[in-house]
């Protein structure tokens, strides 16, 4: 029996995720895409995965560059997430209006992020209408001051109350 794609998507939406922007530079141009299909894979070696739509511009760039960054967005970076997920997706220069630096791997690092992983392409696996890129983490940074992450749940951005903790 075939799964209804909309029902499947809505079910997956009941799993809260952080929001990331995956950035890549192929030596000539930089691109980015919003992604919440991100996960850690292994501590030794340090591996992560990101899932990229087969139609995404970043797909071939990651394959060719063999490197990418994963920027963990802070709560106040909703507009950046929207930019890379929406109208900015097709912009000629996605980074012209944004504050960023180039990482040690010559790939964009968004200013204000709460965490960063610089990765070398370790492997790729087909995954239906997506490609699963596995990255070997070569550099990891995080914001020392705990700041609220940008969350996504039930098709909407959400906030985290950092003062609310389980006993």
Language model: regions and residue ranges:
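Basic, polyanion-binding surface patches
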Residues: 1-167
């Amino acid at each position: 029996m075939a799964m209804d794609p909309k029902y499947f998507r809505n079910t997956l939406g009941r799993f809260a995720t952080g929001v990331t922007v995956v950035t890549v530079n192929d030596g000539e141009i930089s691109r980015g895409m919003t992604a919440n299909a991100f996960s850690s894979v292994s501590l030794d070696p340090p591996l992560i995965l990101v899932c990229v739509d087969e139609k995404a511009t970043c797909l071939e760039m990651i394959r060719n560059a063999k490197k990418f960054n994963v920027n963990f967005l802070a709560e106040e970076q909703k507009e950046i997430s929207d930019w890379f997920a929406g109208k900015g997706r097709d912009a000629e220069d996605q980074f012209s209006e944004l504050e960023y630096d180039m990482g040690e791997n010559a790939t964009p690092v968004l200013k204000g992020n709460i965490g960063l992983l610089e990765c070398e392409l370790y492997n790729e696996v087909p995954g239906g209408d997506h490609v699963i890129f596995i990255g070997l983490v070569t550099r990891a940074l995080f914001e020392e001051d705990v700041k609220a992450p940008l969350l996504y749940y039930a098709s909407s951005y959400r906030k985290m109350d950092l003062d609310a903790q389980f006993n």
